């Protein structure tokens, strides 16, 4: 493992398999190769593979196999991340290499920055998020030569709106049981590779990273009159699995190019600065020379045709992962009040919270006049995810479930004690019975992503996390549910964008999933049972 990226850092990391199960690609062989006839593979004295002809003994060097991020998505040998692949193809070294090639290939560099990454960097440098925003813009635009820099807030809000619309549509068509979020790539890959029975439950709404990428490349290409493949998009995210998400292939035949070319985490950005001190730095002098307002700063580094610039840097209420569970209920309340104002009045709604077995699982219930209208749950960490997936696993109607007699006696004993003491059963969150579940692989959610900056050796863990949470909470909030006109405006702008820039709504907002076939090579079957 590299010093930068280790198993301890990634909450959702599992070591690669002993044998990679990627199938060998058969290339069209030339006439010269065909004349080789039957061959065998041997290792020479230097450990290099050779192809030896059985006809005349002629030898030929073999090229090393190349594994890409796309191969990782199509492989079930590792549950989520293969660290070597992530570092090789989405690293700070790759970004530096791309910047060096800029003079010859005339690439246009653009960047987007997540809220969690901004909070992590602000904590590490002990400053306000607004100040770290100024330093990041200075670093990317003035020092590295990026043309545009935006926040991911606009992409997130479009994602939240589309999530609500998707849930309403599926429920109106009779969908039973919980719909599961797809914003976390670690969770999605886990489901695709080990629990395909839940794929039909997973929402097809794209994440803020991917929506922002599509918007940024399309608007930049139009404004600068260049092709999309001339644009290099860097996304700064809190999680290493976001690198794999960026490599997920698109289904639209006209827009197959990836919307994100490189994903770096705050941890990797700091490493880049340490290794390139003579070229790049978060120059604190930039703060003293930056006298304009934040609004002016955000406007200056965004494309001229980028809408709602300040919105891109604003946050949302709810969890530290984007507030999907909370905003589903709040936007649903807004939807009901707009659709049927005679039946639903805002003042009669309330939101109830129900705790789970631990701090990483809880339930939210939307109640109207003491009647539950809808519910959502927040589930963080793979232990809680496993428990949820087990509950959602379909059971055969012909199979009878045997009850463990010891468990039955224990339950009866506890029930008897409660009855004797007059105690009432305490409600506990049950995500499997909710309408919608926000799922994140990392404990505490995205704010605790594996790519966030580690605490100093002399710092208390709880205090460090608390500082990061405080900085995340300091980002200005713009709640969609508090302004119905804003939500309607964003929906209208999204439709106009898709028409004006010839981008299908499904390409902008929707993703897709598929079951990854299990390996048949026994040497490659090793990690699934550990989850």
Language-model features: locations:
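Iron-sulfur-associated redox domains of electron-transfer enzymes in respiratory
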Residues: 2-531
């Amino acid at each position: 493992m590299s010093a930068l990226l280790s198993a301890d850092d990634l909450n959702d990391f599992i070591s690669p398999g002993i044998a990679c199960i990627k199938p060998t690609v058969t290339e069209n062989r030339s006439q010269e190769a065909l004349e080789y006839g039957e061959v065998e593979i041997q290792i020479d004295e230097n450990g290099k593979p050779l192809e030896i002809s059985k006809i005349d003994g002629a030898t030929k060097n073999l090229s090393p196999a190349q594994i890409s991020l796309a191969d990782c998505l199509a492989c079930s040998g590792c549950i989520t991340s293969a660290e070597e692949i992530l570092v090789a193809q989405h690293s700070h070294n790759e970004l530096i290499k791309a910047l060096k090639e800029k003079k010859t290939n005339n690439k246009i560099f653009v960047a987007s920055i997540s809220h969690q990454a901004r909070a992590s960097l602000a904590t590490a440098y002990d400053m306000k998020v607004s100040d770290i925003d100024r330093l990041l813009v200075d670093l990317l635009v003035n020092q590295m030569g990026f043309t545009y820099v935006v926040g991911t807030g606009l992409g997130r809000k479009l994602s939240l709106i589309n999530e609500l619309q998707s849930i309403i549509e599926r429920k109106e068509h009779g969908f039973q049981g919980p719909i599961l979020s797809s914003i976390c790539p670690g969770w999605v890959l886990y489901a695709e590779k080990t629990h395909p029975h839940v794929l039909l439950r997973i929402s097809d709404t794209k994440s803020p990273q991917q929506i922002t990428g599509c918007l940024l490349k399309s608007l930049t290409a139009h404004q600068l009159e260049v092709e999309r493949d001339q644009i290099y998009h860097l996304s700064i995210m809190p999680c290493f699995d976001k690198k794999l998400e960026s490599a997920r292939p698109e289904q639209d035949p006209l827009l197959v190019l990836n919307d994100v070319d490189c994903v770096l985490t705050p941890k990797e950005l700091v490493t880049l600065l340490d290794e390139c001190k003579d070229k790049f730095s978060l120059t604190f002098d930039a703060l003293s020379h930056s006298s304009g307002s934040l609004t002016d700063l955000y406007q200056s580094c965004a494309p001229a045709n980028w809408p709602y610039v300040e919105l891109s840097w604003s946050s949302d209420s709810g969890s530290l992962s984007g507030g999907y569970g909370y905003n589903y209920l709040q936007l649903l309340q807004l939807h009901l009040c707009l659709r049927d104002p005679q039946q639903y009045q805002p003042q009669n709604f309330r939101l109830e919270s129900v705790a789970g077995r631990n701090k990483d699982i809880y339930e939210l219930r939307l109640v109207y006049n003491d009647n539950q209208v809808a519910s959502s749950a927040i589930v963080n960490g793979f232990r809680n995810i496993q428990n949820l997936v087990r509950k959602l696993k379909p059971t055969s109607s012909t199979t009878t479930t045997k009850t463990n007699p010891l468990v039955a006696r224990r339950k009866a004993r506890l029930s008897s004690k409660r009855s004797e003491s007059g105690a009432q059963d305490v409600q506990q969150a049950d995500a499997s019975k909710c309408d919608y579940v926000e799922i994140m692989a990392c404990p505490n959610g995205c704010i605790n992503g594996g790519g966030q900056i580690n605490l100093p050796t002399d710092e208390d863990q709880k205090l460090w996390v608390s500082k990061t949470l405080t900085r995340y909470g300091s980002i200005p909030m713009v709640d969609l549910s508090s302004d119905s006109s804003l939500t309607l405006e964003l929906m209208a702008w999204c439709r106009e964008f898709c028409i004006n820039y010839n981008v299908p709504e499904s390409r902008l907002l929707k993703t897709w999933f598929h079951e990854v076939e299990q390996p048949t090579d026994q040497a490659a079957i090793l990690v699934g049972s550990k989850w």
